Protein backbone atom coordinates (compact mmCIF):
# COMPACT_ATOMS: atom_id res chain seq x y z
CA UNK A 1 0.00 0.00 0.00
CA UNK A 2 1.64 3.22 -1.19
CA UNK A 3 1.39 6.05 1.36
CA UNK A 4 2.64 9.63 1.61
CA UNK A 5 2.51 12.33 4.28
CA UNK A 6 -0.60 14.44 4.59
CA UNK A 7 -1.00 16.32 1.33
CA UNK A 8 -4.41 16.91 -0.29
CA UNK A 9 -3.43 18.76 -3.46
CA UNK A 10 -6.49 19.91 -5.35
CA UNK A 11 -8.98 18.79 -2.68
CA UNK A 12 -11.15 21.89 -2.88
CA UNK A 13 -11.06 22.06 -6.67
CA UNK A 14 -11.93 18.44 -7.30
CA UNK A 15 -15.42 17.03 -7.67
CA UNK A 16 -15.85 15.32 -4.32
CA UNK A 17 -17.18 11.80 -4.63
CA UNK A 18 -19.87 10.48 -2.29
CA UNK A 19 -21.29 7.08 -1.37
CA UNK A 20 -23.63 7.34 -4.35
CA UNK A 21 -20.58 7.36 -6.63
CA UNK A 22 -19.14 4.08 -5.30
CA UNK A 23 -19.10 1.46 -8.09
CA UNK A 24 -20.72 -1.87 -7.26
CA UNK A 25 -17.33 -3.60 -7.16
CA UNK A 26 -15.60 -0.99 -4.95
CA UNK A 27 -15.49 -1.35 -1.16
CA UNK A 28 -13.97 0.38 1.86
CA UNK A 29 -11.21 -1.57 3.56
CA UNK A 30 -10.33 -0.97 7.20
CA UNK A 31 -7.09 -2.52 8.41
CA UNK A 32 -6.37 -2.26 12.15
CA UNK A 33 -2.77 -2.98 13.11
CA UNK A 34 -3.16 -3.81 16.78
CA UNK A 35 -4.97 -0.65 17.78
CA UNK A 36 -1.99 1.62 17.09
CA UNK A 37 -2.23 2.19 13.33
CA UNK A 38 -5.38 2.01 11.20
CA UNK A 39 -5.67 2.27 7.42
CA UNK A 40 -8.79 3.20 5.46
CA UNK A 41 -8.58 2.37 1.78
CA UNK A 42 -10.50 1.49 -1.35
CA UNK A 43 -10.62 -2.26 -1.84
CA UNK A 44 -12.06 -5.09 -3.87
CA UNK A 45 -14.69 -7.46 -2.49
CA UNK A 46 -12.01 -9.56 -0.75
CA UNK A 47 -10.57 -6.55 1.08
CA UNK A 48 -7.45 -6.18 -1.07
CA UNK A 49 -6.43 -2.59 -1.73
CA UNK A 50 -6.88 -1.31 -5.27
CA UNK A 51 -3.85 -0.34 -7.35
CA UNK A 52 -2.90 3.27 -8.06
CA UNK A 53 -1.66 2.40 -11.53
CA UNK A 54 -4.12 -0.25 -12.72
CA UNK A 55 -7.45 0.67 -11.10
CA UNK A 56 -9.61 3.76 -11.78
CA UNK A 57 -10.15 4.41 -8.06
CA UNK A 58 -7.55 3.99 -5.35
CA UNK A 59 -6.59 5.70 -2.13
CA UNK A 60 -5.72 5.36 1.53
CA UNK A 61 -5.81 7.40 4.72
CA UNK A 62 -3.72 6.17 7.64
CA UNK A 63 -4.03 7.27 11.26
CA UNK A 64 -2.03 6.48 14.37
CA UNK A 65 -2.15 6.90 18.11
CA UNK A 66 -0.14 9.88 19.39
CA UNK A 67 3.43 8.75 19.98
CA UNK A 68 7.06 9.74 19.89
CA UNK A 69 8.02 9.47 16.25
CA UNK A 70 10.64 10.67 13.82
CA UNK A 71 9.85 13.78 11.84
CA UNK A 72 9.34 13.19 8.14
CA UNK A 73 12.46 15.10 7.12
CA UNK A 74 15.06 13.63 9.49
CA UNK A 75 16.02 11.43 12.40
CA UNK A 76 14.98 13.81 15.19
CA UNK A 77 12.39 12.24 17.47
CA UNK A 78 9.63 14.43 18.89
CA UNK A 79 6.78 13.58 21.30
CA UNK A 80 3.24 14.28 20.13
CA UNK A 81 1.50 14.45 23.53
CA UNK A 82 -1.84 12.87 24.48
CA UNK A 83 -3.80 15.11 22.07
CA UNK A 84 -6.93 14.73 24.24
CA UNK A 85 -7.32 11.15 23.10
CA UNK A 86 -7.48 11.99 19.39
CA UNK A 87 -5.94 9.91 16.64
CA UNK A 88 -3.36 11.57 14.37
CA UNK A 89 -3.14 11.56 10.57
CA UNK A 90 0.05 9.82 9.44
CA UNK A 91 -0.34 9.59 5.65
CA UNK A 92 -2.81 10.13 2.82
CA UNK A 93 -3.14 9.57 -0.91
CA UNK A 94 -6.07 9.14 -3.27
CA UNK A 95 -7.25 9.26 -6.85
CA UNK A 96 -8.53 12.74 -7.70
CA UNK A 97 -12.00 13.22 -6.29
CA UNK A 98 -11.92 10.21 -3.99
CA UNK A 99 -9.93 11.56 -1.03
CA UNK A 100 -12.71 13.39 0.87
CA UNK A 101 -14.84 10.27 1.33
CA UNK A 102 -11.96 8.41 2.97
CA UNK A 103 -11.23 11.43 5.12
CA UNK A 104 -14.80 11.56 6.42
CA UNK A 105 -14.64 7.83 7.19
CA UNK A 106 -11.37 8.27 9.10
CA UNK A 107 -12.81 11.09 11.23
CA UNK A 108 -15.93 9.07 12.00
CA UNK A 109 -13.98 5.94 12.90
CA UNK A 110 -11.59 7.96 15.09
CA UNK A 111 -14.62 9.44 16.86
CA UNK A 112 -16.13 5.98 17.45
CA UNK A 113 -12.82 4.53 18.65
CA UNK A 114 -11.28 7.49 20.41
CA UNK A 115 -11.78 11.22 20.76
CA UNK A 116 -11.58 12.24 17.12
CA UNK A 117 -8.84 13.00 14.61
CA UNK A 118 -6.18 15.70 14.37
CA UNK A 119 -3.86 16.69 11.50
CA UNK A 120 -0.29 15.48 11.21
CA UNK A 121 1.53 17.20 14.06
CA UNK A 122 4.78 17.89 12.22
CA UNK A 123 4.27 18.24 8.44
CA UNK A 124 1.14 19.51 6.67
CA UNK A 125 1.10 20.93 3.14
CA UNK A 126 -0.47 24.26 2.24
CA UNK A 127 -3.20 22.39 0.40
CA UNK A 128 -3.92 20.26 3.46
CA UNK A 129 -4.34 23.42 5.54
CA UNK A 130 -7.18 24.39 3.20
CA UNK A 131 -8.78 21.00 3.75
CA UNK A 132 -8.75 21.35 7.54
CA UNK A 133 -10.00 24.93 7.25
CA UNK A 134 -12.87 23.60 5.15
CA UNK A 135 -13.77 21.16 7.94
CA UNK A 136 -13.51 23.94 10.51
CA UNK A 137 -15.53 26.61 8.71
CA UNK A 138 -17.78 24.89 6.16
CA UNK A 139 -18.84 21.57 7.64
CA UNK A 140 -21.64 21.96 10.17
CA UNK A 141 -21.63 18.19 10.76
CA UNK A 142 -18.02 18.27 11.97
CA UNK A 143 -17.04 19.57 15.44
CA UNK A 144 -13.64 21.07 16.28
CA UNK A 145 -12.02 21.31 19.72
CA UNK A 146 -8.91 23.29 20.61
CA UNK A 147 -5.74 21.44 21.63
CA UNK A 148 -2.94 22.92 23.74
CA UNK A 149 0.76 22.73 22.93
CA UNK A 150 3.35 20.73 24.87
CA UNK A 151 4.22 23.80 26.98
CA UNK A 152 0.70 24.22 28.41
CA UNK A 153 0.37 27.63 26.77
CA UNK A 154 -3.44 27.57 26.82
CA UNK A 155 -4.61 25.37 29.70
CA UNK A 156 -3.17 23.77 32.83
CA UNK A 157 -4.29 20.16 32.27
CA UNK A 158 -1.84 18.09 30.26
CA UNK A 159 -4.39 15.74 28.69
CA UNK A 160 -5.02 18.18 25.83
CA UNK A 161 -1.33 18.76 25.17
CA UNK A 162 -0.38 17.97 21.58
CA UNK A 163 2.63 18.80 19.43
CA UNK A 164 1.81 21.97 17.48
CA UNK A 165 4.78 22.07 15.11
CA UNK A 166 2.57 22.21 12.02
CA UNK A 167 0.39 24.98 13.42
CA UNK A 168 3.36 27.04 14.65
CA UNK A 169 5.23 26.63 11.37
CA UNK A 170 2.13 27.87 9.57
CA UNK A 171 1.08 30.77 11.83
CA UNK A 172 3.79 31.42 14.42
CA UNK A 173 2.41 32.97 17.61
CA UNK A 174 -1.11 32.75 16.20
CA UNK A 175 -0.93 28.95 15.99
CA UNK A 176 -4.06 28.49 18.13
CA UNK A 177 -6.15 30.28 15.50
CA UNK A 178 -5.31 27.75 12.80
CA UNK A 179 -7.34 24.64 11.90
CA UNK A 180 -4.18 22.59 12.44
CA UNK A 181 -4.29 23.17 16.20
CA UNK A 182 -7.56 21.32 16.78
CA UNK A 183 -9.09 17.86 16.85
CA UNK A 184 -12.17 16.96 14.85
CA UNK A 185 -15.14 14.69 15.55
CA UNK A 186 -18.09 13.63 13.42
CA UNK A 187 -21.15 11.40 13.92
CA UNK A 188 -20.74 8.05 12.09
CA UNK A 189 -23.35 8.73 9.42
CA UNK A 190 -21.16 7.62 6.51
CA UNK A 191 -19.96 4.49 8.31
CA UNK A 192 -23.55 3.59 9.17
CA UNK A 193 -24.55 3.82 5.52
CA UNK A 194 -21.56 1.76 4.41
CA UNK A 195 -22.35 -0.96 6.94
CA UNK A 196 -25.98 -1.03 5.83
CA UNK A 197 -24.81 -1.37 2.22
CA UNK A 198 -22.39 -4.18 3.11
CA UNK A 199 -19.51 -2.11 1.79
CA UNK A 200 -17.03 -2.49 4.69
CA UNK A 201 -14.17 -4.99 4.50
CA UNK A 202 -12.19 -5.30 7.75
CA UNK A 203 -8.71 -6.79 8.09
CA UNK A 204 -6.11 -7.03 10.82
Label the model's feature ranges.
Residues 41-56, 88-94:
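Secondary-structure transition/turn motif
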Residues 1-15:
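Short acidic, low-complexity intrinsically disordered linear motifs used
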Residues 73-94, 120:
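Conserved acetyl-CoA binding element of GNAT-fold acetyltransferases
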Residues 14-22, 27-37, 50, 57-78, ...:
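Terminal substrate-recognition subdomain of acyl/acetyltransferases
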Residues 94-110:
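Conserved acetyl-CoA-binding loop-helix of GNAT-fold acetyltransferases
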